[in-house]
Amino acid sequence: MRGAGRRVAITGLGVVAPCGLGKEAFWNGLLGPGLNDVGRATEITDWDPSPYYDSPKDARRADGCEQFATAAAIEAMAQAGHLSAEPSRIGTIFGTGVG
């Protein structure tokens, strides 16, 4: 298998989920008491994508899945800090359940 035996380092993690936005909030949401109000557990409420875009226009043009992916990627890169590896050796893995 090509690449077998190579090491991988996970340096950042970004999460946008109904139980929390960001790594810490997500973890606390998983460990928390659950929903207090009757509602949809799969819904992200009070979402504001504007902090993740250069302009409000760009934020409006992006669909929800793109907004969440952008926010998660920015969080992961912030956690990773400065990466000294060659850019061609840096990668991102993105997963979604519905988007």
What are the residue ranges of the model-derived segments?
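Conserved "HGTGT" condensation-loop signature of ketosynthase/thiolase-family condensing enzymes
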Residues: 1-99
